[in-house]
Amino acid sequence: MGMSKSHSFFGYPLSIFFIVVNEFCERFSYYGMRAILILYFTNFISWDDNLSTAIYHTFVALCYLTPILGALIADSWLGKFKTIVSLSIVYTIGQAVTSVSSINDLTDHNHDGTPDSLPVHVVLSLIGLALIALGTGGIKPCVSAFGGDQFEEGQEKQRNRFFSIFYLAINAGSLLSTIITPMLRVQQCGIHSKQACYPLAFGVPAALMAVALIVFVLGSGMYKKFKPQGNIMGKVAKCIGFAIKNRFRHRSKAFPKREHWLDWAKEKYDERLISQIKMVTRVMFLYIPLPMFWALFDQQGSRWTLQATTMSGKIGALEIQPDQMQTVNAILIVIMVPIFDAVLYPLIAKCGFNFTSLKKMAVGMVLASMAFVVAAIVQVEIDKTLPVFPKGNEVQIKVLNIGNNTMNISLPGEMVTLGPMSQTNAFMTFDVNKLTRINISSPGSPVTAVTDDFKQGQRHTLLVWAPNHYQVVKDGLNQKPEKGENGIRFVNTFNELITITMSGKVYANISSYNASTYQFFPSGIKGFTISSTEIPPQCQPNFNTFYLEFGSAYTYIVQRKNDSCPEVKVFEDISANTVNMALQIPQYFLLTCGEVVFSVTGLEFSYSQAPSNMKSVLQAGWLLTVAVGNIIVLIVAGAGQFSKQWAEYILFAALLLVVCVIFAIMARFYTYINPAEIEAQFDEDEKKNRLEKSNPYFMSGANSQKQM
């Protein structure tokens, strides 16, 4: 064992200060990066929702698979301290690479605001995420155990309080990061053009991880550093493998059956190890249904965040970003854990109900299932507010009069009269085969026929400004703007080209009496500048939008005033989101309550039922259930392809209820044990065996005393 001089502070080893600060910074780094990851995939890399969800959950699964590797390295090779330092360096590099991958100007050679070589960003992102998964997962089983190693015998009370402080540091880091990094994301930054500031939002977590590493290394001289004692997981695997191989080797009836399949390892392994593995496998068997809970729980960062992008973030005077809704879980967990421990559980006990650990976990599954039912109800309400878009062989038309004359528009079954600078109330839907001709006219003028080839499944805007002057514009917006952003396009009624710059994005060379394509912006007031060679120098070229909310689309008409200066008129194409993000709070509340009675209880149950030297084995098994849960999401998201998102939520809720019933049946037949008593019995037996070997008269003397 590597020892250093012990320093204490109020009875606690001073070294744990460095470990707690390290954990706070590391959790800030991890959860801060993870909070914005799904929106980075959809907004910056432009993956669709299903692929983004799949990559997100693949990453999370890797983060919970690599703890096994970290435990192996620490126990059999480097020890906990060197493992934490080595993998923290890998972790920091991964965060830095991810931040670099999000720099738009890295490949934006033509300075148009979009990457010219998206594969470069994708490859860098995946390399960064792989390094992060190796780093965060590898140190996960080491840091808390290393903190526990710092205490002396007789400091059990301080050690227990340390784990409470450690858990608080985790939640504090998670809470702050999920508030701060989304705020950094919505800032505008860039060298040649301005975009959502992902480099800063990823860069701050990278800096915090570097701080975590530095703080941890600074405490090096105060730590107790135990040398690797051999990997118990390897011994467990070898014993199980030998038992299975030996059992199949003696399949014939000539060999008598043994009480337990692990008893076939007795030829090579001692009774104590076999008994300990039996305890572990009994708990591991109960772990089989548990991944389904995590399949639902970890969708907070994917599906639920994407759901929030279709909602309004205005809550009173506050404006909540979609990825900030995850802070609700972190806030509620800090509130609910003490309420459950100090109020709810004692109240249940006073009522005479034996609320065992496994019963609590089953209740947690039910609560998580209910949370997804609530999420489905919220999704149905969201779907009701969505505009109707053309399907199949349908086409939608909106007419916008950008001239100074009253115009009459004749469509199949529709006759519309529009005054100057006005539009139809909504998009009109037609069968594409029947929309062969649109007639436009004004009082005293001949009729002009519009016979353009309207593309099926598309929205079109018919710009008219005189009886024989029109322009058909394909909108290119056949769904609500994604990620809660707002679509803006401009129509030029000048007789010359104009260029408009808005928040770093350029609408270049919009031709006369034509429309630009939509560009997309986050919520807020956006400034824009109109430039043209024909605008007099005394004119004010700078304008502001009104306040953009979430998920809207607008057409801005640029027209000339009597003094030849430009002015702007606005028409709504798609209304803003109206279902408020606050409606997600009930589903977060139910899921958080489920987490308290499932996750916290599950860890306590695993610890209490594990032999002293195999608690790390069960910890690795517990983390493995999280990884498998994320793999389940991958399978469902990849294979389901539901046309309605609420249906996927209901499927997950139903699957978890079925799994809960199976788990309840399995738990019914589980017998709680006290590993300490079993190990004490082995200690007593081994002590007797040693006495027998050293004193052959030990048993005979004892027997003679019994006879006296």
Swiss-Prot record:
Instruction: Spell out the GO cellular component terms annotated for this protein, sorted alphabetically and separated by semicolons.
Output: apical plasma membrane; brush border; membrane; plasma membrane
Provide the tissue specificity: Expressed in small intestine.
In the record, what lineage is assigned to the organism producing the protein?
Eukaryota, Metazoa, Chordata, Craniata, Vertebrata
Query: Where's it found, cell-wise?
Result: Apical cell membrane
Q: Which residues lie on this side of the membrane: Extracellular?
A: 22-53, 104-118, 183-198, 298-327, 383-584, 641-645
Per the UniProt entry, the signal peptide is none
Q: Which PROSITE patterns match?
A: PTR2_1 (PS01022), PTR2_2 (PS01023)
**Glycan attachment points:** N50, N404, N408, N439, N509, N514, N562
Q: What is the membrane topology here?
A: Multi-pass membrane protein
The record's section on InterPro entries has: MFS_trans_sf, Oligopep_transport, POT_fam, PTR2_symporter_CS
Name the Gene Ontology biological process terms: dipeptide import across plasma membrane; monoatomic ion transport; protein transport; tripeptide import across plasma membrane
Q: Which residues lie on this side of the membrane: Cytoplasmic?
A: 75-82, 140-161, 220-276, 349-361, 606-619, 667-708
Effect noted on mutating D573A? Does not affect peptide transporter activity
Coarse class of the protein's main subcellular location: membrane
- List all membrane-crossing ranges: 1-21, 54-74, 83-103, 119-139, 162-182, 199-219, 277-297, 328-348, 362-382, 585-605, 620-640, 646-666
UniProt family annotation: Belongs to the major facilitator superfamily. Proton-dependent oligopeptide transporter (POT/PTR) (TC 2.A.17) family.
Which key words are in the record?
Answer: Cell membrane, Glycoprotein, Membrane, Peptide transport, Protein transport, Symport, Transmembrane, Transmembrane helix, Transport
Free-text domain note: The extracellular domain (ECD) region specifically binds trypsin.
User: Which catalytic reaction applies to this protein?
Assistant: a dipeptide(out) + H(+)(out) = a dipeptide(in) + H(+)(in); an L-amino acid tripeptide(out) + H(+)(out) = an L-amino acid tripeptide(in) + H(+)(in); L-alanyl-L-lysine(out) + H(+)(out) = L-alanyl-L-lysine(in) + H(+)(in); L-alanyl-L-proline(out) + H(+)(out) = L-alanyl-L-proline(in) + H(+)(in)
State the SUPFAM superfamilies in the record. MFS general substrate transporter
A molecular-function term among this protein's GO annotations: tripeptide transmembrane transporter activity
Task: Tell me, in a sentence or two, what this protein's role is.
Answer: Electrogenic proton-coupled amino-acid transporter that transports oligopeptides of 2 to 4 amino acids with a preference for dipeptides. Transports neutral and monovalently charged peptides with a proton to peptide stoichiometry of 1:1 or 2:1. Primarily responsible for the absorption of dietary di- and tripeptides from the small intestinal lumen. Mediates transepithelial transport of muramyl and N-formylated bacterial dipeptides contributing to recognition of pathogenic bacteria by the mucosal immune system.
Q: What is this protein called?
A: Solute carrier family 15 member 1
The segment annotated Extracellular domain (ECD) runs over 383-584
Domain of life, per UniProt, equals: Eukaryota
Quaternary state and interactors: Interacts (via extracellular domain region) with trypsin.
